């Protein structure tokens, strides 16, 4: 047998224990930490967004997104806690209520909150797309009533699609433990799960709740980035300037939109594939457990962190956050001072480079003009040897107190003669030169 075959056999023989280990690490240690970060962040965001300062329609979508993500983090934390208790000898699996929660609520609530968050992001991206691409129609189209209807629809669509999942996906089973003299409740796959009609429902649900939002987000955000690029080029052509602070903010927004698209693709597609493939047989395989753990962690991380990404790019949000939590003002001020120092340093370096280039040009002009003056003086001296100096010129030279015994023309006279055609320039020290 080849080495690869031996390794494959070894993995398959130890896969149940290894799969359980992977599941314990992912769901008992990693996911609770991510959920804690998401819960703290979204509660903070709801407190900040409750301010009167942030009453624009766009912030309605952000508040709805915070609610959906907060519910998702809470549902995941409850799921992880109950699974941990059930696997570590707790009596929680001896209650019928826990079986009802496992079969009909546990995964349904998590997936409903995830789907609602995704559709809220779609509604927010659509609002942003109309404001950028169709600014003339945005004022009449955008209203709190329309935003409220969009948010309600975003929460209703996943709920409707997950009703059959909640009712028929799993069935309850029970066994009597003779050692403990108690009834143990658990869940198992329902037979309807293998039927053709269920497969149609499953693929339709995942296509509408997972893949369709990813496609919509990708198309909308790409269109927004293209519109920003066109606006940047138009601005640069009209003003004939290089990139400044405004265009740098546009670049930051485009990077944020591109990151949103990338996060949607990377974090949501594996989770969608996982929901299409999952069954009790696959759960015993090590490779599937690794894929499932990574997919779930990516999806939860996306929903725990995407609100930070949206709000970190809003100046109004940061200002309101510092008003709500003044203890962070010192750190924020220190960071601003550091950024200001870096910007000033870069500006000084660029200015010094520009001044050095200008000074070199001016020195070259001075050297060129000095060479021309020396050449003119030399020709004048040659001309004076052959032509006598007129009396009035000598009188002027003597009256000015300059020596004329050498027969040389003074440089001041040359400047007077040619000053009418020479261009005088002043440098930064008010030094005049040709």
Swiss-Prot record:
Keywords: Cell membrane, G-protein coupled receptor, Glycoprotein, Membrane, Receptor, Transducer, Transmembrane, Transmembrane helix. The keyword DNA repair does not apply. It is a multi-pass membrane protein. GO terms for cellular component: plasma membrane. The chain crosses the membrane at residues 30-50, 65-85, 105-125, 147-167, 208-228, 258-278. Its main location: membrane. This is Probable G-protein coupled receptor B0563.6.
């Amino acid at each position: 047998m080849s080495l690869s075959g031996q390794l494959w056999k070894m993995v398959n023989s130890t896969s149940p224990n290894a799969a359980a280990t992977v599941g314990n690490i992912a769901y008992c240690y990693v996911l609770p930490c991510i959920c804690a970060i998401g819960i703290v962040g979204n509660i903070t965001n709801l407190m900040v967004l409750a301010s009167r300062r942030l009453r624009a329609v766009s912030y309605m979508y952000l508040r709805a997104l915070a609610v959906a993500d907060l519910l998702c983090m809470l549902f995941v934390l409850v799921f992880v806690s109950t699974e941990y208790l059930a696997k570590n000898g707790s009596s929680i699996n001896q209650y019928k209520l826990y079986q009802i929660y496992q079969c009909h609520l546990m995964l349904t609530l998590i997936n409903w909150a995830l789907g609602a968050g995704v559709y809220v992001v779609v509604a927010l991206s659509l609002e942003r797309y109309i404001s950028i691409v169709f600014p003339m129609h945005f004022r009449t189209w955008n209203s709190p009533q329309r935003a409220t209807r969009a948010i309600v629809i975003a929460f209703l669509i996943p709920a409707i699609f997950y009703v059959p999942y909640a009712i028929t996906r799993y069935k309850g089973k029970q066994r009597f433990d003779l050692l403990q003299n108690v009834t143990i409740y658990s869940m198992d796959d329902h037979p309807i799960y293998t039927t053709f009609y269920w497969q149609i429902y499953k693929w339709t649900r995942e296509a509408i709740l997972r893949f369709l939002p990813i496609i919509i987000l990708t198309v909308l955000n790409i269109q927004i980035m293209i519109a920003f690029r066109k606006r940047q080029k138009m601005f640069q052509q009209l003003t004939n300037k290089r990139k400044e602070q405004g265009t740098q903010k546009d670049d930051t927004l485009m990077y944020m939109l591109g990151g949103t698209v990338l996060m949607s693709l990377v974090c949501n597609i594996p989770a969608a594939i996982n929901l299409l493939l999952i069954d009790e047989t696959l759960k015993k395989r090590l490779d599937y457990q690794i894929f499932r753990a990574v997919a779930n962690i990516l999806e939860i991380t996306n929903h725990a962190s995407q609100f930070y990404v949206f709000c970190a790019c809003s100046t109004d949000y940061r200002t309101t956050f510092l008003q709500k939590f003044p203890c962070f003002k010192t750190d924020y001020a220190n960071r601003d001072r550091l950024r200001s120092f870096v910007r000033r340093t870069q500006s000084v370096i660029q200015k010094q480079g520009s001044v050095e280039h200008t000074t070199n040009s001016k020195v070259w002009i001075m050297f060129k003009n000095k060479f021309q003056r020396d050449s003119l003086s030399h020709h004048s001296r040659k001309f004076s040897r052959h032509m006598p100096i007129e009396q009035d010129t000598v009188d002027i030279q003597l009256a000015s107190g300059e020596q004329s015994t050498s027969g040389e023309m003074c440089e001041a006279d040359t400047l007077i003669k040619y000053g009418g055609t020479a261009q005088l320039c002043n440098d930064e020290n008010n030094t005049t030169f040709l």
